Every structure is written in structure tokens, then in C-alpha cells.
């Protein structure tokens, strides 16, 4: 530059992009190292890609590991990271290892203390640059070799025709660069960002009272803050889950909890099975601690502590069929696996809309209607009754079957009752409205999975009452 007397380095095309991306990825690597364990680490990345992407894809056609198709949330994000790490190598060899991999960065820091290292035996060299052209880490073995960038591919040893490069215990004769290529200002900026990232992202209070009640962790999970510290997002727990209910979380736990395991009761074949502890025994970091079946069910030595609870089911009365629409349904109560059941029902009777049969006539066990208004056999389910009141008689009789203009009852209705004494004839439905006992509910989610209300279920599991964090309890504790 003629104004300041310094040489100008010109970047064009992809060089501009990769130069900028390199600084960004280095900074991101520092932040990720302190904030998101396993997010870009190579081993969890491979396991996560296999578990959430490759195996489900293989099962969709060949059923290699599962008889049923397995589904995982956020598969597009997993695929994006996996294929980006794979195909960016076509632009720059070993792109992931050189610019992204946090494990490679750690090895680079420790590499300066290695006993054995690549280097020149003598400084004299023909400068053919064959070693540089074959170097996988672009660490410039022909000159001052960048020790933190060397991946020990050994290509330079086999490429040098003069055999000037060796794997020795002494330093390279042409000199070494042992420090990372990061200025003091850049180091300070990266360190400040890394240190400030966690408290800034936790300002929303997700680990306190502002926790997401829809975030259900697998049984045996540690308290949330410790769970996030340990979980490496490998996806092994989701892979071994027999019902496919464990899913990689994308949004509920925030950026700290990206790809951590959470239960989605709507997916898979059922909820969390009572006799299964597979996820707790495969977790490599004990973010989900190993538990026995006795501990999960609260039996034997664990009877006093009770079963492990991952949440509590709540009935949404605005969507529940018996509560909101006067339609008989006890699916959640029937499927509750706890004994005695955590879901019980309260019986009541409600008059069906348009069920005033004041113009009907009773003949023995048959009710004759003046108009053909009924759908044949619709009332023969055992939940419909005819309520008759008149004089001193008040009787409710179950319906066996019906035609368009007649109803057959299970027994004769008050044969001594005169037709002139009838005050009310109504068509009623027996409703069994579900109730949840929070002292018995373990949050397994089978009721939510089996609920016939599609979309937003009428009964849903919430994290309140989970065993791993007593502060999430919604019940008053005795003094």
C-alpha cells in the first residue's frame, strides 16, 4: 500500500470466505468447548449421525435394526451438520479436522510437548515442495513446521525423495511454530466470549423457575444443570429405546440442550415402558445414571423412596372427550400401567343433546319414537340409557340396541307407570371422567400416547413432580 508502506495481501474467491470462516470457527470452537459438550466433537458427531440419520434411513427400506420405522426430531439439522462436515472436505482437504474439530484443537495444544514429532533432519532442502503438497494438515513441513496443525499423516516422510524429513525426538532443523495461530487480542476476545456465553444464555432462567414443563428427561437423568454438563449428545439412549419415545431435543432446552435426549410421548409405539431401563445403562457419561428395575418401580430396598417419576400427567378438560364433548372414553385409564392405577374415573350421567323424548311412547322394554331420528345401533354400546320420571317412578335403564325410531331397553321400565303420568323421558349417556392421582403417577406417558384425541392430546405429561429435581414438585411438602 503506497500510503502506509505495507504489502497488500490479496484474497479472491473462496480464499476470502475460508479466511473469514476460519476466524469464526475458531471463536465458535472456544465457545463450544465451554458451552456445548459433544456438539461438534467427532465421536459424538459420528454416533449422532449414525443413530439419528443413517440407521433410520436404512430401516426405512431394509429394517436392519428395527421392525418399525423409527423417527427422530430435527433430522434435517443432524443431516446438515453431518453432510457439511463430510462435503466441505472436497473444497479444502480435512476441513473439519483443521478448522472445526475441538478434539483436534486440544491435541494441537498438547502437541508442542510431544516426545516424537515430524521435522527436518537438516535445514538444507531443494524446496521442491512435494511434502507441502501432500500434507493433510497444511502445516508446511518444508519450512517452519506448524506443530499444532500436524496430524501425523506421515505423507511428508514418504514423499521426500531426499529423505530429509523424519519422525524424531529432536526439533525440526528448519524451526517450528508451536503456538496456535491466534493473536493476543483474538485470544482475549475468544476467552471473554467463552466465559460470558453460559451466564448470558442462562439469563432466561431455564434452569430455575422458568423451566419448560414440556421437557421430560429419561428416567435416571441427573438434575438439569449437571445433566447438561455431562451429556455429549451421542444419541445412544435414543437408539436403544424400544418404543422410540426418546428424541433429540431441538428447542425446549435452549441452545445448551441441543440434541440432548427428551421424551416425546406422541412418537413411537408407546410411552416409557415400566420394565425398561436400557437408556440408563448405555449412557457413556452417566448423564442418565444406571438404575435397576427395582429402583425404577420403587420396590424392595427402594420401596420407601417410591418409583422414579419423570413427570405427572394432567387432564386437559377443554379437549377431553368425556369432559368437553360428553363422549364416552376411558382409553387413558385402561392403558395406565401403574397398579393401583394412577388414573381413575368418576361416573356421571348427562342428557344427550336433543335427547328430550317427551313425545315418545313406552311399550314394555321398547321406547317408540314419533320420528325416525336415530342412527341405527349407535346407542347399543352400553353407555347410553333412557331416564324416565313420572309419578313416584324415577328409573334409568340401559339401552341394548336401537333402530331409527325405536329403542330396545335392557329391562321393562316401571310397568305400573301410566303414560299419562310421564313427566320426563330423556336419552342420557354415562360419562366416566378421568382424574389423575399425582401420588401414583410416574409420568410414563403411555396415557398421552394412547389418547384418541389427535394433535394436542387431552392428557399430557408435564415435568412437574419429577424425582430428579424436587423443586419441580407442585405439591405442598409437610413440615
Tell me what each language-model feature is:
Residues 1-479:
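Non-ligating segments of multi-cofactor redox enzymes
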